[in-house]
């Protein structure tokens, strides 16, 4: 018998190597995903803060609330961070809730 193919031992070794690679890779992907969502939220807050400033410049320094920014098209309605946190505007400052 001179059949070519993988033995059971060879298949087990391959499965072990793949499992180890997955154990190393998955936690890193999760960690980077959380970091990306946090930075995305920070960027969105900065954008909303810039829109608050633009509104104030257009309206003689009046501090807007969220409804005013949404109704005049400065920001989209129901704007949320990538991680699901809502954007809150208080005293002219944007922050994640």
Swiss-Prot record:
Disulfide bridge partners, by residue number: 41-81
Keyword Membrane assigned: yes
Keywords assigned: Cell membrane, Competence, Disulfide bond, Membrane, Methylation, Transmembrane, Transmembrane helix, Transport
Organism expressing this protein natively: Bacillus licheniformis (strain ATCC 14580 / DSM 13 / JCM 2505 / CCUG 7422 / NBRC 12200 / NCIMB 9375 / NCTC 10341 / NRRL NRS-1264 / Gibson 46)
Propeptide segment residues: 1-5
Biological process (GO), any one: establishment of competence for transformation
Xref: InterPro entries: Bac_GSPG_pilin (IPR000983), ComGC (IPR016940), N_methyl_site (IPR012902), Pilin-like (IPR045584)
Entries under Pfam families matching the protein: N_methyl
Location (main, coarse): membrane
Location of the protein in the cell: Cell membrane; Cell surface
Assembly with partners or alone: Homodimer.
PROSITE patterns with a match to the protein in the record: PROKAR_NTER_METHYL
GO annotations of cellular component type: cell surface; plasma membrane; type II protein secretion system complex
N-methylphenylalanine: residues carrying this PTM: 6
Bilayer-crossing regions: 6-26
Protein name: ComG operon protein 3 homolog
Topology versus the membrane: Single-pass membrane protein
Family: Belongs to the ComGC family.
Job of this protein: Required for transformation and DNA binding.
């Amino acid at each position: 018998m001179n059949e070519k193919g993988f033995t059971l031992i060879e298949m087990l070794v391959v499965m072990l190597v793949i499992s180890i690679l997955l154990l190393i890779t998955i936690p890193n992907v999760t960690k980077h995903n959380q970091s990306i969502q946090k930075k995305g939220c920070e960027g969105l807050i900065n954008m909303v803060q810039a829109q608050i400033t633009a509104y104030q410049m257009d309206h003689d320094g009046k501090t807007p609330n969220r409804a005013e920014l949404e109704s005049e098209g400065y920001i989209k309605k129901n704007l949320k961070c990538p991680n699901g946190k809502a954007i809150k505007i208080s005293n002219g400052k944007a922050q994640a809730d």
